[in-house]
UniProtKB/Swiss-Prot annotation:
Domain of life: Bacteria
Protein name as catalogued: ATP synthase subunit delta
Function, in words: F(1)F(0) ATP synthase produces ATP from ADP in the presence of a proton or sodium gradient. F-type ATPases consist of two structural domains, F(1) containing the extramembraneous catalytic core and F(0) containing the membrane proton channel, linked together by a central stalk and a peripheral stalk. During catalysis, ATP synthesis in the catalytic domain of F(1) is coupled via a rotary mechanism of the central stalk subunits to proton translocation. This protein is part of the stalk that links CF(0) to CF(1). It either transmits conformational changes from CF(0) to CF(1) or is implicated in proton conduction.
GO cellular component: plasma membrane; proton-transporting ATP synthase complex
SUPFAM superfamilies: N-terminal domain of the delta subunit of the F1F0-ATP synthase (SSF47928)
Assembly and oligomerization: F-type ATPases have 2 components, F(1) - the catalytic core - and F(0) - the membrane proton channel. F(1) has five subunits: alpha(3), beta(3), gamma(1), delta(1), epsilon(1). F(0) has three main subunits: a(1), b(2) and c(10-14). The alpha and beta chains form an alternating ring which encloses part of the gamma chain. F(1) is attached to F(0) by a central stalk formed by the gamma and epsilon chains, while a peripheral stalk is formed by the delta and b chains.
Main location, first listed in the record: membrane
Membrane topology designation: Peripheral membrane protein
């Protein structure tokens, strides 16, 4: 587990518990996704440690929220950002968002599967893949499909700590390892 994951965990857990208590989980998912996008921007990343930048950023971010979702920061959202800012932890917002979603999926008994594919999958292929994984895990599956041309062909699927690598690259790597082992 990375240091960022370790640092983000208590924030994600606290926010999730508060969101469940106030029945605002969906709002928090949206808020954290938007905040993650902003904080992940390269131009923003460079200035996260600057107090004056953060003051302006928070004002600008709130204006964006008013325009995009029709409402300003809630008191809880503002407190969350202020705590992260005061502790110099704004850069971990994307990891907090990831862990928040994991907590949500776990509470809903949903499995998140990340599918890496060499070529884009059409909707029919996604639904078939989702149904196959659901049969294996015996629960609902949410797919996160990402194109990764380096796989050459096929797919690599990650869920519940498991990796199923059916990519051409993975097969070539396994074949190369077998050759190396046979030489020794």
């Amino acid at each position: 587990m990375s240091q960022t994951e370790t640092i983000a965990r208590p924030y994600a857990k606290a926010v999730f518990e508060q969101a469940v208590e106030t029945e605002s989980v969906a709002n928090w998912i949206d808020f954290l996704e938007i905040a993650s996008t902003f904080v992940s921007n390269e131009a923003v990343k460079e200035h996260l440690a600057s107090a004056s930048f953060m003051e302006n950023f928070l004002v600008w971010f709130e204006q964006f929220l008013v325009e995009s979702r029709g409402e300003a920061l809630s008191e809880q959202e503002r407190n969350f950002l202020n705590v992260l800012n005061q502790q110099g932890r704004m850069a971990i917002v994307p990891e907090i968002a990831t862990q928040f979603k994991q907590l949500y999926y776990s509470a809903q008994n949903v499995c998140k599967a990340t599918v890496y594919t060499a070529l884009a999958l059409d909707e029919k292929q996604k639904k078939e893949l989702q149904a196959t994984i659901e049969r294996n895990v015996h629960r609902e599956v949410v797919l996160d499909v990402r194109e990764e041309p380096a796989l050459i062909a096929g797919v690599r699927i990650e869920y519940d700590g498991m990796v199923i690598d059916q990519s051409a690259r993975g097969r070539l790597e396994r074949f190369a390892r077998m050759l190396d082992e046979s030489r020794n």
